[in-house]
Design a protein with these regions (language model features):
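Bacterial N-terminal signal peptides
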Residues: 11-22
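Histidine-centered active-site/metal-ligand motif
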Residues: 3, 74-77, 201, 279
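Sequence context surrounding c-type heme c attachment/ligation sites in exported
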Residues: 24-32, 117-396
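Conserved small-residue
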Residues: 27-90, 96-110, 116-122, 129-176
Length: 396
């Protein structure tokens, strides 16, 4: 029996039951207070049948302007708040109410042989199970005491995802849609454990609480199709639904994928989302003295002509974080281009190198001028995207 046939057989009864229930009552998501459901289905976020995984109509699909890279996985992100609750905008950040449930489902398109396909994510609002493989769904829920992170791993039949607080791994083989002649890549996809979830979602160490990284005000300024079909900024969708009291003021966030922008702005936007949650003055990587949020005060704090202080062997025997005009001599480029566990950055969330991201950082460093032999921070700071005044707060 094929993978799809087995899934169809196992979910036929479930689909029939859901149809019967739909005729009797409207299915709505559930907020489970101070508990950890073992099955993803207990949250009632999705309609799952033999053809697709689709968020319920009352659940909003969201997409951050600058997504995190996770081994070229596609992601379906959702947001839901209990009826009668509303988030507040406080200092341009969203303060979500107790009961808010965020989810992010990681999946890949697959070919007939079961290989996962490296292809651009088109931002689908549902997942077609006939040509996709579900890997994991991460749930971030706002409890009374703060945010709680729950990793759920999908079974092989794609009928249910189960809580795995210790994480998991999945061996995968990836082919590239744009170049079929490229040899397939075998790698291990790692589902983070509970502590690793906390490590990234806690941007103020050691005593700060977890919070979202993508579903924040600055990352939701991009336009998207809402559940009602309207194409508008996602923040305005939340306000229209009554889920947010007001929209933040100011321009939309730069996207690192927007090739019409100057290379410096794109590079800062990329580093902010991929690295800024740790590399900020209060983050887990504060001992490095490296600020990659885009809110650096000097070029040196961004890494220009800055010697490493906490990189260990991960520096690749290089002298400076960024050497203007020379990416091959820059530790920043070296670490994002590495896939070795003791060298790569980010150190969690990937097994593969984000080739497009590395190319962006390489091009940007190549445009920088100046010399580390004659470093002048005031001279370098205003060049090629280092101007602190143009930086925006883009991570929580």
């Amino acid at each position: 029996m094929t993978h799809s046939a087995l899934r169809a057989f196992l979910t036929k009864g479930l689909a029939s039951t859901l149809l019967l229930l739909a005729g009797c009552t409207e299915v709505t998501p559930s907020f489970v207070a101070d508990a950890r459901p073992q099955r993803l289905s207990e949250w009632n976020l999705f309609d799952l049948n033999t053809q697709r995984l689709q968020p319920l109509p009352v659940v909003e699909v969201v997409k951050p302007t600058n997504p995190l890279f996770t081994d070229y996985a596609h992601k379906l992100r959702t947001l839901w708040m209990p009826e009668g609750t509303q988030a507040r905008l406080v200092n341009d950040e969203i303060d979500y109410p107790v009961g808010t449930v965020l989810s992010k489902t990681f999946y890949y398109p697959v070919d007939d042989a079961g290989n996962v396909i490296r292809v651009a994510n088109q931002g689908a609002r549902e997942i077609n199970l006939a040509d996709s493989r579900l890997i994991e769904t991460r749930v971030l829920v706002r409890q009374e005491a703060g945010w709680d992170a729950l990793p759920y791993v999908w079974n092989e039949e794609e009928t249910e995802a189960f809580l795995r607080v210790a994480g998991a791994s999945r061996p995968l083989t990836m082919v590239t849609a744009a170049s079929p002649e490229t040899p397939a890549t075998q790698f291990a996809y790692f589902v983070p454990n509970e502590n690793q979830c906390s490590g990234c979602h806690t941007t103020e160490h050691p005593d700060g609480g977890m919070h979202p990284l993508g579903a924040i005000a600055s990352q939701l300024t991009a336009s998207s199709h809402s559940a009602s079909g309207e194409f508008q900024p996602q923040i305005e969708t939340l306000v229209a639904r009554g889920w947010l009291d007001r929209a933040p003021q100011g321009p939309a966030l730069d996207s690192y994928e927007d090739t019409s922008l100057p290379i410096g702005q794109r590079a800062l936007a990329y580093l902010n989302m991929q690295c800024g949650h740790c590399h900020n003055p209060d983050g887990a990587a504060d001992t490095s003295g490296l600020v990659l949020t885009g809110r650096h005060k000097t070029a040196v704090s961004m890494g220009v002509c800055k010697p490493p202080v906490a990189a260990g062997g991960g520096a690749g025997d290089l002298q400076y974080g960024i050497v203007p005009g020379d990416p091959d001599s820059s530790i920043l480029h070296y670490r994002v281009a590495s896939a070795k566990p003791d060298e790569m950055m980010p150190e969690l969330g990937r097994s593969l190198v984000h080739e497009e991201g590395v190319a962006l950082i390489r091009e940007w460093i190549g445009t920088l001028t100046g010399s580390c032999d004659e470093q002048s921070d005031s001279r370098i700071a205003g060049e090629s995207g280092f101007e602190p005044s143009v930086a925006k707060k883009t991570t929580g």
